[in-house]
Curated annotation (Swiss-Prot):
Record gene name: Sipa1l2
Cysteine pairings via disulfide bonds: none
PROSITE patterns: PDZ, RAPGAP
CDD domains noted in UniProt: PDZ_SIPA1-like
PDZ domain ranges (all copies): 951-1027
GO MF annotation terms: GTPase activator activity
Name recorded for this polypeptide: Signal-induced proliferation-associated 1-like protein 2
Record organism: Rattus norvegicus (Rat)
Amino acid sequence: MSDPRPSQAEKHKLGRAASKFKDPSRAMQSDDYFARKFKAINGSMGPATLNTSSLSEGGGGGGGPANGTPAVPKMGVRARVSEWPPKKDCSKDLACKTLWESRSQSSYESATSIIQNGQNDQVDRQQEEQLDLDFVEAKYTIGDIFVHSPQRGLHPIRQRSNSDITISDIDTEDVLDQHAVNPNTGAALHREYGSTSSIDRQGLSGENVFAMLRGYRIESYDPKVTSSFGFPDFFPCDTAISPSLHAAAQISRGEFVRISGLDYMDGGLLMGRDRDKPFKRRLKSESVETSLFRKLRTVKSEHETFKFTSDLEEGRLDRGIRPWSCQRCFAHYDVQSILFNINEAMATRASVGKRKNITTGASAASQTPVPVGPAGGCESPLGSKEDLNAKENPDADEGDGKSNDLVLSCPYFRNETGGEGDRRIALSRANSASFSSGESCSFESSLSSHCTNAGVSVLEVPRENQPIHREKVKRYIIEHVDLGAYYYRKFFYGKEHQNYFGIDENLGPVAVSIRREKVEDPREKEGSQFNYRVAFRTSELTTLRGAILEDAVPSTARHGTARGLPLKEVLEYVIPELSIPCLRQAANSPKVPEQLLKLDEQGLSFQHKIGILYCKAGQSTEEEMYNNETAGPAFEEFLDLLGQRVRLKGFSKYRAQLDNKTDSTGTHSLYTTYKDFELMFHVSTLLPYMPNNRQQLLRKRHIGNDIVTIVFQEPGALPFTPKNIRSHFQHVFVIVKVHNPCTENVCYSVGVFRSKDVPPFVPPIPKGVTFPRTGVFRDFLLAKGINAENAAHKSEKFRAMATRTRHEYLKDLAENFVTTTTVDTSAKFSFITLGAKKKERVKPRTDAHLFSIGAIMWHVVARYFGQSADIECLLGISNEFIMLIEKESKNVAFNCSCRDVIGWTSGLVSIKIFYERGECILLSSVDNSSEDIREIVQRLVIVTRGCETVEMTLRRNGLGQLGFHVNFEGIVADVEPFGFAWKAGLRQGSRLVEICKVAVATLTHEQMIDLLRTSVTVKVVIIQPHEDGSPRRGCSELCRIPMVEYKLDSEGTPCEYKTPFRRNTTWHRVPTPALQPVSRASPVPGTPDRLQCQPLLQQAQAAIPRSTSFDRKLPDGTRSSPSNQSSSSDPGPGGSGPWRPQVGYDGCPSPLLLEPQGPGSVECDGSGDHEDLMEVGRLPETKWHGPPSKVLSSYKERALQKDGSCKDSPNKLSHIGDKSCSSHSSSNTLSSNTSSNSDDKHFGSGDLMDPELLGLTYIKGASTDSGIDTTPCMPATILGPMHLTGSRSLIHSRAEQWADAADVSGADEDPAKMYTLHGYASAISSSAADGSMGDLSEVSSHSSGSHRSGSPSTHCSKSTGSLDSSKVYIVTHSGGQQVPGAVAKPYHRQGAANKYVIGWKKSEGSPPPEEPEVTECPRIYGEMDIMSTASQHPAVVGDSVPEAQHVLSKDDFLKLMLPDSPLVEEGRRKFSFYGNLSPRRSLYRTLSDESVCSNRRGSSFASSRSSILDQALPNDILFSTTPPYHSTLPPRTHPAPSMGSLRNEFWFSDGSLSDKSKCADPGLMPLPDTAAGLDWSHLVDAARAFEGLDSDEELGLLCHHASYLDQRVASFCTLTDLQHGQELEGAPELSLCVDPTSGKEFMDTPGERSPSTLTGKVNQLELILRQLQTDLRKEKQDKAVLQAEVQHLRQDNMRLQEESQTATAQLRTFTEWFFSTIDKKV
């Protein structure tokens, strides 16, 4: 017998198979690993007999087992693992286990001597030492056990026909040696397969062992024996009591097999988590083992084989097993480039072109599974079951078990029945729902403004394309499209570049394209002038595409020279595994780039064919559907919706293999286009029908070869299952069932079947919805079909086909299109360098790659918050995207735009990235590398506008207050100057992202406030604001991508926005108009009739996706996310969600936005698109040129006609004061008395400032102030105004950033863009009607005043009827109409306010206006609603005076009000619509008994008046500069109210943080000078009122101050109102309605540059108005000219079209005449 101790070189020599051994005994030696374990358990064994059908009997050798009875395994072709060997004594087993787990590197004999109780080893001691050393040198993985690869020198266990041992009988310290013998018997342990072997040796050539294993079926398979592994049945065993599993478990616990993250295995041989390393030498890379096991357990395809190096004694693995890591400095162009793995290409090279066809699609489901029994378990890989069983056991997949009335669960298929959504690994409120059942995921992802994970492709976005991605603007995102395939066409084709082809010995045919280009913006690259673009292609479908900066490449040449670096050095650095000498330069032929284009773009197709099967009632089988000769009316209706019928004969567009010449495939077909795609439908009823052919092969020939099939079911059809279909190609079935066909309420329900290896695709089907018959449903269905086919191409079957094609392309290029020129070396041959020392390469510039445009990649571990797990990912950060790609599934797990990143918290080895509204992802470095985190932070600084977060610990003052306001977004609205929060560094505009370690993104507003109020220690993590004080926001909040997309039907009325579905089938209870969208200015929540439509409203709100974090609580208590108005950047003032059914002013809706509605009519979202609004909103021209009197008076007329419920209730507000009194405690931590207020709110008047109209949030019972500064119980008289004016609105925000954008404000605005003063006044009163002072979440305190994404924007109001909020609109009632008293009655206040009406005239009961306490009045704007009714509707005060509507520029109004304001100094700069679009609304803070300056009661009043213009004019005051600070303290030196004080009040509210920093220490509540004429008793009463004491005196006093201060504002508004009249050039009537005394007193402003008298103001106004009129007149003239030009162009266009048609007809006539003449001559 030959020496059983071969040398290492001999033992591991590559390419040596067992069949080459000359010695027969050696040839039969076992390669099992567990020989010593066998001795311990089984004792000595007798001589083994070769090639017999019986197992050798143990016990013949030196000693018996511990129990004294030799164990005899059962007889048979295979050893029964489940019952062999018998269970040993527990103590003995324990001893074995203890020894095994405590084993160190001791020699083998010391261990085995204990286990075997003195058995004499028959193997030489030196051999044992050698074996043990071998084990120490090479740690064997699970791949060693299962992979047979003779060429690698590794020989795993085989299932033998004749076996003498079982799995558990082998010791794990045995080395993999084909020459090993049984130490006890001397018999060879390695057995060749016996005569009954069913394993075909063709698979053992080393090229692919999994092909052999997958086709192999175990011979004597007992039904009770199941596999304990996740692999095809390699080892049959009984998982219940098998001692084999116990032994294997011990082996695993002893770290024989070390596999990371394995949890799902049956706890036997393969155990889960990582262990400590007991040996010095392990497999070097943990990721190597993970990748290995991942591939093993998924058994994806044959091409995933694993290669080992020949020098295992060094413990090294070949690079084929190690995940390839591209150079960090390489910037990837697209997602699939990040997934490029050159090692996979090496591993799969041998199997390319040899992969078997496997049964997939419907055929896999239709195959009847063959039960596996003892007789049927063994089949050859080449047997009859090859196709079906090539991947795994046919009965292994039972489907997902999901069924409904549309679909039945089916093996090999996965169902989508509704509610499925994209996986979210980020920490947000949305990921609390499960991945598969989260209904919110469905609605969010169906219309999200963000790319879905599968929709992200190109990562490098040019600067000019960054503002808006066109794909996002469209309704549905197309997924699974490799848009990066255009890389060569875009950056190489037609440009100077080099192509190199070759056949690498490891990779096979390869193609490299490389081009040096100058960086377009060197400033971004910090001096780097050039980069190299590289495209590297192998036979794998993934291509390495990207660029590397020249400065990042180590080279022997100088960087930045005109010549550039040697290409060889660039390629060696980027792709070190590539054999550069094999490359040859491509031939100089025009065919080369064309072939490369075909190669790269072979997977791109914009032409799809989709089959349509018609299923009648009671049908379900394929044969029945194919034999439906003609279509029914319901099917015809569906086809008409889906596309257009085309005549096939002569059809020149995409015909999908249909005959367009002889009509052999039918005369007509269905064709349509969607985005860039052409779709031809193979409709079963339009294809030829053969009465005598039951199989209808002419139809099945086309439909059966379509990947995607739509199955249309009539009512009564049976549920569909792919089991009834027989086709290898049909991988996706979209089931569409019609309800109420051929009626107005026709709708469709949808379900989807997809083959199990087809990845999910969007748009997701919302749960429990039906789709109306609209264009939106059509788009949904077409997008679903396109994405289905794209996803199907990701399945294994189609990828294998594409890989073969790609391999042939590359092979052809490498063989037929190359020259003899190799890749250039660094320098040409030079005599000077002969004999010189080799030149060293210059090190690259540090961190140069961080300035690349493409995606830089890091290996990280991401926290999956939805499942509380960690997943290994690849982090890619480009100039546009941040994405995480899961290593295991190779799918994008997360993506967001860099412009949405607002901050990050970086640690030593981890980083938390916050984006959008505080959602976050948590990443940590794989190898605990702090350098990776540093680079990630640097990269974020370069490509985002975020910043590092700051952690603060906030203290409470003596009253338990934190001293700041925070709105529902977590943005700090106000900070008490010099308070604890201010001293800690908290500033206005800061964004709270964590409160007490809880992410704000996961909290509702109420939870956030409760956390701040109740936490003993308040630790917050904040993101500092921008330098201008504006909070950091994601781009999706600021610009709302995509824009609103209206789709007009045939009547020209807009269909619903991007909401293709409703929550339930009650969607169709409304007539056809219900299918139309909510007009932006249309919804009126104040009508009781709307209560009937609440289900519809809830459906509408649910359909609107959310990209903002606000909540809206519906009447039923559910929360909605209304702000993402169809992912709109301009939702307009009209509703962006459901409306509160409660009346605004007890049933009196807003006079501006009312819809015509008859009594008792039902109005739902989208059900009333009204004529006047459509006049404004339907066409832009009408918006620009509609007469203002017609537009706005019609609003007001409808206001009067809409609801008469307010006519009998002049004092209806008397009950509100009681409702507002909820909590009078002043000990709350946030100085809030009414933070969680009364729930019986009334809100939503439908006014322009109605937060529901603004798309703002509604949180029932939550305080906008976050309870930090809210009000005590206040009287109803001042209740409403305080509701709005108690908060500051810092609107300086982001006007500067958009100053150069489109300008829609200015003096030349069209009069159609107007507010009625009544409109925004009623907004205040409507909020007052809410009855809850502290309950202002619906007008939530936005710190920066710009609109929320879903809130009204002004520039897109052409289609919505919204008005321009960049101007102060002062509109009087026109037409001489008598305003009914009912309009004014709701604006009267109970108590003191009812004694007089604020306006230019005051009643006798009003106190004298010279009280200086007016500056402490809590309502500068509070009574503006009364003022507006007095000024606009003189019927309230006296006779109606007909006045025209007028508009005053906002800038001019501010100049009038604030002469010294920076707005004037800046020359009345205009503000872009982006400022108005910004999702930040004005900060509407409730009146507080304790102001932000907690001890100064009155100062909160003064500071809170700021919002008067903000409430009236959302985003009207976008202060783009930092205004000077003006004290909010009452002016103690001015006995009369002054414009200066008014200005101060404005600017304190709107000032930036730098202004606040100049505040003096507030001290106690300021007291006015006694000389001011204020009675001290009144002051005491006021103070008592602040403390929550309810007294008539207090009410009257406060009401008086509020109304008087508002009177001053009213005076200016009315001045503007009067002077802007076209009939009033000079306003001589002013003296008639203005009290000269009062006018003097509150117009006199000592020390101001502006005129100090009313006359001066009038003159100033006259000048302004004349200029405005002049500008307006010029603008109208210009527009008229433009309209005339447009009309001329249209006429010219029509004329040219007619001429073209005439010329065409003449040419046709001439052609016919010509040919007829020729024919006659012939």
